[in-house]
């Protein structure tokens, strides 16, 4: 077994990429086309939920135009991901051939960053999803890679994680309610009432205690609080239970002695645990119940402040799952929500129709930069580099993502390094001639 960092030291670092590690026995260009084919086929499978999920959820409203749009989105994601991944590995060959050896940052990090530039052609929706997922993985990886007092607290203190998740929950739900942030989050906020609704609430507040109580409105309108709460619980169970069932079916291996598909599925279902269902249910229950109670007992507070407190309290549902990845994901999404608010403020302050101040060109330029694509490229460079060099800092979900978008190529490279001794790698290199083309 060879420590991955030994790749950058003699004698391995001076071997040609067609001799060992990368693509022994075949040329660089052939390696690129092989990767492009394998990544395209693997991507059709890995990204199939992008096609199947809309067809299932929108089966009643699906028409020809919607289907073609969904299919186009799916195929574009598969193609550009395959191109980016294949080009990244081909850039490893280019850097090796130009520099004459494998170097630390020109072997994995820089080739990946360059190859990921094909993601500029990816649909914005998919790009934002990839940027969020990889940013969460990088944040968690950095916490594991650089252990100190602060990172240990963030990784191992449940109370700290819960408090920060609650803060992030309040920020995200607040900006989703204002329609500033429109992407994924675990909970949908109740809608913000119109000015006419607030006027009605103010008038109702002056009604005497013996008046008809049905006239009073809560944050959710005219429906009863019990129905508002029950609807949230139903949505939580509808979202969480399928995820837990899928997790039970996909996680782990089939127990030994299971004969037949039905027996294997039943054995898998026995491992069912309501992890996500419990999280969604508790999140919805705490968030919606606290919203009603705050409106009832602290109605003198502003509606936005009430909602911020309800969103904060709802985040305490983190205690049910207690996973670092949930905390890191919430931090990334909260930053995205704050950034979206910043962009809106910049647009409003520089609008010549509503503002008398001169436009701030620096802020306008900063707002228009596609940071999601830039950050994603850097994220992928970090993740691929550490997949080979510091495998333990990446979580299982990240490893699966990298295997999926590279058709297991990153895993093959790592296994070829770690599962062979130094002598075996040298012997493999000597047994293969240098092939620079095909």
Give names to the regions the model predicted.
Residues 97-106, 150-155, 299-304:
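A cross-kingdom feature marking solvent-exposed beta-strand/loop segments within repeated
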Residues 80-86, 103-111, 285, 302-310:
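Short hydrophobic alpha-helical membrane-embedded segments
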Residues 96, 143-144, 291-295, 339:
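Alpha-helical tandem repeat RNA-binding modules
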Residues 284-313, 331-336:
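Active/binding-pocket-proximal capping segment
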Residues 1-77, 81, 85, 90, ...:
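Intrinsically disordered, low-complexity N-proximal targeting/linker segments that flank membranes
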Residues 96, 116-123, 314-322:
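Hydrophobic alpha-helical transmembrane segments
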Residues 89-100, 115-118, 293:
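Helix-loop-helix transmembrane hairpins and adjacent membrane-interface loops
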